[in-house]
Amino acid sequence: MPRSQRNDNFIDKTFTVIADILLKVLPTSQREKQAFTYYRDGMSAQAEGEYAEALQNYYEAMRLEVDAYDRSYILYNIGLIHTSNGEHGRALEYYYQALERNPSLPSALNNIAVIYHYRGEQAIENGQSEISQILFEKAADYWKEAIRLAPTNYIEAQNWLKMTGRNTGL
């Protein structure tokens, strides 16, 4: 039984029912319906912290999904899982792949910036001030692009950019 059919959460059940109705009335292929079911099950597993199960569902959704825009969200969610697991290098790979398919994905840009900022902080702790500045500049570039796409979001990033004098071009 698919995960989406065994949800105990009211909101998840409601989403599942609505999604199932939409899948029945929208003119989509069986392959697209299967891809969406795996994606939905991946999101459900991810929300419950079942990352291995979520990844299995996302990989299956990727195998079936042909639309680049839809694939971008699957890749983004895979990146989120790797970020949560502390696998920042792998997360970056998936965020970059998501952006290749959907350049207007500010959340992926933000998450890339967060990783570069984190690495910059680590470089400071390791006494690598030159490397930290390079990483902070990369973070600033990605945050600026995320803010350009979503000007009312990422307030903390906007404040950091102002405080560090990196807010030029906003």
UniProtKB/Swiss-Prot annotation:
Localization terms from the record: Plastid, Chloroplast thylakoid membrane
Record GO biological process: photosynthesis
Topology of this chain in the membrane: Peripheral membrane protein
GO cellular-component term (any): chloroplast thylakoid membrane
Bilayer-crossing regions: none
One of the Pfam families matching this protein, by short name: TPR_1
Alphabetic keyword roster: Chloroplast, Membrane, Photosynthesis, Plastid, Repeat, Thylakoid, TPR repeat
Principal location listed in the UniProt entry: plastid
Per-repeat ranges for TPR: 35-68, 72-105, 120-153
Key word Plastid present: yes
Similarity annotation: Belongs to the Ycf3 family.
Alphabetical list of HAMAP family matching this protein: Ycf3
Biological role stated in the UniProt entry: Essential for the assembly of the photosystem I (PSI) complex. May act as a chaperone-like factor to guide the assembly of the PSI subunits.
Protein name as it appears in the record: Photosystem I assembly protein Ycf3
Organism taxonomic ancestry: Eukaryota, Viridiplantae, Chlorophyta, core chlorophytes, Chlorophyceae
Gene name of this polypeptide: ycf3
